[in-house]
Each structure stands twice: as structure tokens, then as C-alpha cells.
């Protein structure tokens, strides 16, 4: 998958941008605040329907403009698509694929599998379980056709159950929710466990390359006691859940944990080591998608040189070259990118929201 052309209107300081990209490496060079991250953010938004910088769309739309528009030409093998997303200041979104209305953000996300590597991305390792569940669920979204619907229904049922807990005086009032909830919880947890196990060899192999001095291990935790029946657990924990006001145990509490030499990685690794591990995880997941589905991810890398020495930057660059993926990389100077100079690439200078090829 690759973006061949991108048009941007009124997205932060990018008021009018029309760019053609290389299917390999694309370098974005410019000072802090010039618009490099905004371009990566626009690409990410097109593939996710949300920003990785802000949850408030009005902060993304250019000042005094009613909306922003993102439009791209994308290619995968012999197939081509034209995709567009318009976000109104009132909050509404319009998604078009090949000129047709009525599409959803999930349709865009399926067309544009992306991996994001940013300095803030360390939350995957030192943040809460929600970030690691999202990591697993991203993979399942692209591997299992039925996962997204199951995930949506699971979250809907949990919200309904939590609302019912506020009014319930006895467990029987929740049985209507729990019969379906238990089925979906087992299905989603089984998919997550299978995916985590399938991904584990890829992660361990990539970690040996990036962090050979450490023994990295991974483990999946489903969100409730491993040997407990989830239906029985919901009955037994009714009074506790009712007192707290929400469902404490279940797939919404699942986690995917990482250890280095037997200890939690967030406790023992430096920031540089954490970034390398995060890069290894993103690369492993992208390579797993390629092996299983023959689909390339698009890699978005913000502030390439941050936290990495020259040798590690060269190592990451070589692994990205081998992946065959389209890659977008931002840096302050071209010197920071000298380890990443494949034959096929394009460099753009970014200055105060203006982007021009060099």
C-alpha cells in the first residue's frame, strides 16, 4: 500500500498542499513548528479518522476555516483508489472512496494500514493497558474480517451493562446483557490470544536484532482470572461492580505485557531502549501483516533522530528498507537522515506550512 498523491486543505498550518510521493522513502526536513509533524498527522488522520496529537478537531482545522479536506490517490499492487475525508467544524465527517459517499472511517482504515513511530509513542510500553490493547486490536482489525463488528458490539454491550448497573438491585436485571456479553468476551479474547501468540516470534526475532543485550518476553492477559468462567465471574462480582458503577473484569481490561530479563520493561529500560523496543514492535507487526496478508503498512516516523544513536538509526533504516513499505520520515536536518538514503526516495523541505520537493 502506498500513497502516490496527497492534497490537503486547511489542516493546521497546511492551508493548500498538493504533493506526489515516492512509493519508498519520503523525507520531510524543516525546523520545529514548520509543519513536518502536521503532514504526518494529516496522513495518519486519513487512515484513522482521528489525530495522534489532539482529540479536538476544531484545533486541527485552520483558523477561521469551516473544515479541512484530505484527499489521496493510493495504490496497492494493481489496484488504485481515490479516497477523501472532510471534517467540519461542527464535528461531522464525510468519507468518500472512489467518489462514493456513505463510507465509514473503518473503510479508510482498512485501505490504509499504518504504523506510527513518534517520541510520544512510548505510551505503548509505559502507558496503561489501553495502548497495548489497541496494538493487538489494530492487528486483529486487519487480520480478521469479523473482528471490528465484534469489537464494536462488545463495547456497546459493556456501556449498556455499566448503565444498567447504576439502576440494578439484583443480578437478574443484567442477565439480558450478560448472555451476549459472555459470548463476545470469549470470542474477542480468543482472537487476541491467538494473535498475540502468532506475533510473539516476530517480536522476539526483531528484538534480538535491536536489543541483543536483553531477553525480551511477551505475555497476553485476557482481563479476568485465566481459569475462571467469565459468566460465573460476572455473577459473583455483581455486588462489587454495582458498588463501583462499572464492570471491573473482562476483555476491556486485557493487557499485552513486555518484560526484559524477567522485569517489566518500563522499570528497567532507558528511553533509548524503550524507543528501540517500540520500533521493534511496530516493525514486527507490519512484517507479520505482510507475511500473512501480503499487505504493506505505511510507516510514519516523526523526529527520526530522537533517542537513537547513529548505529541504531542505521539499523532501523536498514530494516525499513527491507520491509518494502512506503515510509515517511521527519527530521530537522538532512544530516540526521544520512543513514537512511535508499536509491528510491524523495525529500521535501517544509517551511511555515509550505512544502516543496528538493
Curated annotation (Swiss-Prot):
Signal peptide as annotated in the record: none
PROSITE patterns assigned: RECF_1 (PS00617), RECF_2 (PS00618)
Disulfide bond sites: none
GO cellular component, one term: cytoplasm
Chain residues that bind ATP: 30-37
Family: Belongs to the RecF family.
Biological process terms in GO annotation: DNA replication; DNA synthesis involved in DNA repair; double-strand break repair; SOS response
Localization annotation: Cytoplasm
Keywords from the UniProt entry: ATP-binding, Cytoplasm, DNA damage, DNA repair, DNA replication, DNA-binding, Nucleotide-binding, SOS response
Main location: cytoplasm
Gene3D superfamilies linked to this entry: P-loop containing nucleotide triphosphate hydrolases (3.40.50.300), RecF/RecN/SMC, N-terminal domain (1.20.1050.90)
Pfam annotation, one family: SMC_N
GO molecular function: ATP binding; single-stranded DNA binding
Protein name stated in the entry: DNA replication and repair protein RecF
Biological source species: Pasteurella multocida (strain Pm70)
Cross-referenced InterPro entries: DNA-binding_RecF, DNA-binding_RecF_CS, P-loop_NTPase, RecF/RecN/SMC_N, RecF_2
Biological function: The RecF protein is involved in DNA metabolism; it is required for DNA replication and normal SOS inducibility. RecF binds preferentially to single-stranded, linear DNA. It also seems to bind ATP.
Domain of life according to the entry: Bacteria
